[in-house]
Amino acid sequence: MTMRASRRAPGSVGTVETRFLDLPEPLPLDCGRELRSVRMAYETYGQLSPARDNVILVCHALSGDAHAAGMASTPASEGTRDGFRADERDGSLGKALGWWDGMIGPGKAFDTDRFFVVSTNLLGGCRGTTGPSSIDPDTGRPYGSDFPVITVADMVRAQRAFLTSLGITQLAAVAGGSLGGMQALEWAIRYGDDVKAIVPIASTHALHPQGLAWNAIARNAIVADPDWQGGHYYGTGKAPNAGMGIARMIGHITYLSASALQTKFGRQLQSSDDVRYRLMEPEFQVESYLRYQADAFVRRFDANTYLYMSRALTYFDLARQYGGGRLADAIRTISAKTLLIAFSSDWLYPPSGSEELAAALRDAGKPVSLHVIDAPYGHDCFLLEEARQTPLIQAFLD
């Protein structure tokens, strides 16, 4: 099994296609329901070894998709690399590049000369995997808000069913940032015998109360938009774009640090040397930037998927789910070696969460390494500080 690739530049996996697989069995969910006819969107990079033992699963964050590396064969109108400094980082290639292209490829952190890297769009997504915008086989209409509430465990359960359908039963590693790191931790606990190593980056064993609050505000911005229509806006010609844009603005600010915003924008005015005394138009460059981010995000992402992904990551709590409220008890079944990477300026997923998890693993005699990288960009560092993460991951996977 190999990826479909062409036009390969040095260090690149080339041009790739997103493919699709329908799970052969209904998928049971934590909420007690099950999903029939689950489709998974995925991409692969590198070559599967004859023993099928060189597989790395990379897991995306809230707004990602299956296109993690290379150039999309059919680029979307808006790419997933639309965050902080995207234009200066990617230039005209941004809409076609995978969201973690700097980390996946020959000689990169997840070296496709050694590993067969798999990326899926998460259950509940809007980029090819079954989610709220998919057709409910029982009604013939989009699920909308009738889609069942899902958890990170459900996402991982879908990934495992997908990999089993490909004939893959062992993973050399599971890696991801933010929500992706939560999936890696879930894999290590739920399917520990299947996973040799995990790499949770800028992640946590449970989101802190401030993170819960920011996610709640973003979700409320969406459902307060009249065009949300109770979640059944598909086919009406309207969508909750205003609420979704505000949710993106809120989320985007939580991904950045105060110093990053100060360095890039300060208090620079948008289009003049003095204020224009306009109530509604952006006066400051940072206001214009947030509006640009909101408009781009609305064009590529589904509001209901945002609601479901946000809810899933707020439910995630290893201690509550697996340890009766004690993290030390929750992680006792982990056998995979663990590399934790955190960033000094990340206040949404602060280093303290990774430090607490590392201490629990260490006290339980588990193999764990923790690296806190001093970097100024906040939570988005896991997408921006690729060069500094690469040697840590390469050494860990050797």
Tell where the protein language model's regions lie, with residue ranges:
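Short beta-strand/loop motif that positions the catalytic acidic residue
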Residues: 334, 340-342
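Short alpha-helix in the alpha/beta-hydrolase fold that links the catalytic acid
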Residues: 321-327, 350-360
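Conserved hydrolase catalytic core segment
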Residues: 170-212
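Conserved acidic catalytic loop of the alpha/beta-hydrolase fold
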Residues: 140-146, 153-173, 182
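Alpha/beta-hydrolase-fold enzymes
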Residues: 194, 200-296
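Catalytic active-site module of serine/aspartate enzymes centered on a nucleophile-bearing elbow/loop
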Residues: 356-358, 362-398
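Catalytic-loop region of hydrolases
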Residues: 1-58, 67-72
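N-terminal cap/lid subdomain of alpha/beta-hydrolase-fold enzymes
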Residues: 43, 51-136
